[in-house]
């Protein structure tokens, strides 16, 4: 896992060049969840498994999002979500009940379908299916979360001194392939003196300050939008015990 985190850091610093590194390896570097083993023999079983219904709030959001986008074409995703969340909170219980009742009805249908579906499976198939569903759920949850955070404009994490150096030197580095270029940059970094590295250390510290300031602003927006679930754990704890947020 440490290796994967290290590679992600380098690729983030490279931007498009990082994608080239992956292409040179034959495929893009996957997220850690992509390496979860999924038994292929049950893929067709999972494909025919009934899908869970979406929540009442998600139904409302999906219904309202196109409307809000059409009315506010230049609005940021965070602003749209904030407005939809506000509208949902202010929605009368009688109107919320429409979405809640629709969800309950779909959930009942889902339970009946999943019950009939499991009756057709052997015990070993059920065990393997449950494992595959969990694995796919974790992978999908991670991908969805990452996509959502990108759409919501979550600030990019600060770069290390080494990643700052890679971003600056990669294009001009010697090598016929992206892998060779990266190897050259890595060796050059190792050969830098402490005084030469000082510049990149300073830039990395500045980037860390940038990240802290942007995260503070972003999390304030998420609190206003009713998305406290996206806050960092330390911020959640401070809010829970009534301490200052920062």
Swiss-Prot record:
Positions bearing Phosphothreonine: 122
Keywords carried by this UniProt record: Activator, DNA-binding, Mitochondrion, Mitochondrion nucleoid, Phosphoprotein, Repeat, Transcription, Transcription regulation, Transit peptide
Modified residues (Phosphoserine): 55-56, 61, 160, 193, 195
GO terms for cellular component: mitochondrial nucleoid
Keyword Mitochondrion tagged: yes
PTM comment: Phosphorylation by PKA within the HMG box 1 impairs DNA binding and promotes degradation by the AAA+ Lon protease.
GO molecular function, one term: mitochondrial promoter sequence-specific DNA binding
UniProt signal peptide: none
PROSITE patterns on file: HMG_BOX_2
Pfam name, any one: HMG_box
GO biological process entries: mitochondrial transcription; positive regulation of DNA-templated transcription; regulation of transcription by RNA polymerase II; transcription initiation at mitochondrial promoter
Claim: Iron-sulfur is one of the keywords in the record: no
First and last residues of the transit peptide: 1-42
Residue ranges: DNA binding: 50-118, 155-219
Site (Intercalates between bases and promotes DNA bending) residue list: 58, 182
Subcellular location: Mitochondrion; Mitochondrion matrix, Mitochondrion nucleoid
Domain of life: Eukaryota
SMART domains reported for this sequence: HMG
Record InterPro entries: HMG_box_dom, HMG_box_dom_sf, HMGB
Broad class of where this protein is predominantly found: mitochondrion
Disulphide bridges: none
Free-text note on domains in this protein's UniProt record: Binds DNA via its HMG boxes. When bound to the mitochondrial light strand promoter, bends DNA into a U-turn shape, each HMG box bending the DNA by 90 degrees.
Protein task: Binds to the mitochondrial light strand promoter and functions in mitochondrial transcription regulation. Component of the mitochondrial transcription initiation complex, composed at least of TFB2M, TFAM and POLRMT that is required for basal transcription of mitochondrial DNA. In this complex, TFAM recruits POLRMT to a specific promoter whereas TFB2M induces structural changes in POLRMT to enable promoter opening and trapping of the DNA non-template strand. Required for accurate and efficient promoter recognition by the mitochondrial RNA polymerase.
Quaternary assembly: Monomer; binds DNA as a monomer. Homodimer. Component of the mitochondrial transcription initiation complex, composed at least of TFB2M, TFAM and POLRMT. In this complex TFAM recruits POLRMT to the promoter whereas TFB2M induces structural changes in POLRMT to enable promoter opening and trapping of the DNA non-template strand. Upon metabolic stress, forms a complex composed of FOXO3, SIRT3, TFAM and POLRMT. Interacts with TFB1M and TFB2M. Interacts with CLPX; this enhances DNA-binding.
Protein name: Transcription factor A, mitochondrial
